[in-house]
A protein has these predicted regions:
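Residue-level preference for long, well-ordered alpha-helices that form the structural scaffold
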Residues: 35, 196, 254-261, 265, ...
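Active-site neighborhood of glycoside hydrolase catalytic domains
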Residues: 261-319
Length: 331
């Protein structure tokens, strides 16, 4: 504190793969990993925020089957050396493009231990306008505690699969929706790896002009600015971490290579879900795409982990081997 600080970034691309394929595992020193697309760097909008020792670390707004209801999970971080007694926490919901406040309530939060503290609040707003592909209404939820304030944009909506006489169908806010989608490989002009705001908006607008109501981030984690415009303009998205091939014969080696692989693939998935789980446009996570092996114990464990991080979205996992593909999914 009070001194000059240096933040250093190391960017590596040991494989240098400019092919569209990300399926071949390669050896990098003592590790096996998946190839990238030959690009590297800071791909998002990054900011460094200074806070007091009591601050809001995260807000997860969980949509509910009643689309006018939300469950708000707030992570308050106590970085002092001692537990804190009762603190006041203010929650406010207002229109994203407007001044109308729909909800404002102060809560008393008891006994904040040192470290992370999760608090859950249930909010039901019958007057809230629902988010849909035709009417993408957005709201801001603000949480204040101590001197810190955290604002998260979101939409009221519920996306689900229903069994209609043996036929699985998608529903958005209780109405059937037939998904018309295409894949985006996330190769972008100018720098290859990430879109400018102009290109991000253009992709969403182009998809809607073509009559699509959805796009897939194919074999790659998506970009926040693309999802931001999808939220604003009304386009659904499917997202997957990508590059999850690994020799099935080495799944249970329990050596440095396998430990690195499973730690790496799980970390990618965790970061993807935590970053993107408040976007109303994002409705499906896919854990693996066309992996040539049957699901293993580690795959089911990864799906349970993903579901615990975000129980509000559909999870799929496409694994296959001869003679036919097999899908494991949960919602």
């Amino acid at each position: 504190p009070g001194q000059e600080n240096v933040i250093a970034f190391r960017i590596t691309d040991p494989n240098g793969n400019f092919n569209w394929k990300d399926s071949q595992v390669y050896t990098w020193g003592e590790y096996r990993t998946n190839p990238s697309h030959g690009f590297g760097g800071i791909t998002g909008k990054v900011e460094l925020v200074a806070t007091d020792k009591l601050y809001i670390g995260d807000v997860f707004i969980k949509n509910q089957p009643d689309p006018h209801s939300i469950e708000v999970e707030v992570t308050a971080c106590n970085e002092t050396k001692n537990p804190m007694k009762a603190q006041k926490m203010l929650l406010t919901v207002k229109e994203h493009k407007g001044e109308k406040v729909l909800y404002r309530k102060e809560y008393s939060v008891e006994n904040l231990v040192v470290g992370e503290n999760k608090q859950t609040f249930h909010i039901h707003l019958p007057a809230a306008k629902l988010w849909s592909t035709d009417s993408p209404h957005l709201y801001d939820l603000s949480v204040s505690v101590g001197t810190d304030n955290y604002t998260q944009r979101f939409g009221f909506r519920w996306f689900e699969v229903k069994d209609i006489h043996g036929d699985k169908q998608f529903f958005l806010n209780g109405k059937r929706i037939v998904l018309r989608t295409a894949i985006s490989w996330s190769f972008w002009p100018d720098n290859g790896i990430t879109p400018s705001d102009e290109l991000a908006r253009r992709q969403v607008e182009s998809a809607k002009k073509l009559g699509l109501n959805m796009l897939n981030f194919h074999r790659t984690i998506g970009h926040s600015n693309v999802l931001d415009y999808a939220d604003e303009l009304g386009l659904l998205y499917f997202e997957e971490p990508g590059g999850n091939q690994y020799p099935i014969s080495h799944f249970n080696d329990n050596n440095k290579q396998s430990k690195f692989y499973f730690a790496y693939r799980n970390e990618k998935l965790v970061r993807m879900i935590k970053r993107d789980r408040n976007h109303p446009s994002l409705v499906i996570y896919n854990l693996h795409n066309e992996r040539g092996a049957w699901p293993q114990v580690q795959d089911y464990a990864q799906m349970r982990m993903a579901h615990s991080l975000d129980p509000t979205r559909i999870l799929t996992c496409l694994l296959y081997t001869s003679p036919s593909p097999r899908d494991i999914s949960g919602s």
